[in-house]
Amino acid sequence: MALQTTATATVSRTYPFSVRRLSDVAGAEISGVDLRDPVSAEMRDAIMAALEEFHVIAFRDQNLTKDEQQAFTLNFGEIEGHVGRLNSGEKYPIVHTVTNLDEKTGLPTETPTTHGNYFWHTDKSYHDVPSLLTMLHAIQTPPEGGDTLFANMLMAYEALPDAEKQALDGMRAVHSWEANRLNTGNTPASEEQKRERPPVNHPIVRTHENGRKSLYLGVHIGHVEGMDYEAGRAMLADLLDRATAEPFVYRHAWKVGDLTLWDNCVLVHRADRNYEMTAHPRVLHRTAVLGVVPV
């Protein structure tokens, strides 16, 4: 699939770091920055401006410990905790590992604990207050493949016919941890997890502070509020299929040392199994920043 991996558009503003646009859909490479250094207010604002322009930004050649990644993340807001658990029963730590390594053997596997990552989603939409930013720091990557795909929900919304935009306006979908587990074929949610994360509803069309609108979709959705269950799920499946079509997708090819940030408010993403999963480790350290209630 020849996804968007080149750019023709230019960078729209001046930044205090080197920026190279990676595609016209989303994505920019930032170089010449050491994220272990203190982050000034000016630098933080510039990073947030870059996220608004590019939606996904990759700081190359970083070498952060988990503590350093946590410290960097805190510049952007409150770090989220997690509802997911390791096979041991313990909850994921604040800086947790996204990997294809088996928890018991430490060897690469085709069925990692985090296999829900291979479905289109936006992080923590099963919360009243979902994720704003997610950060992944690439520790080990396959020699080829193991990419992450990002679909631009602003572009997908703008491409809809006007009549469909009007029909979707005001519609809400119910998101839950229980739906996530069912839709991804994972172990069903425990009663404790259901109590901790009861279903929430969010608009299918999200309106942002700058006035732009985007679709708000993904695998965490169980059904459409006030609509026949099967008809609503069919509508959502069709909408997500069109929204993640090739013209709206940027593929990020990981390099060891990447610290990649993305805006969950305007993107859905998924990992790709486009590598020999039983032969090559894929290890990334993850943090996420709490966002705002979608409107």
Report each predicted region and the residues it spans.
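Fe(II)/2-oxoglutarate oxygenase catalytic core
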Residues: A2-L261, C265-V295
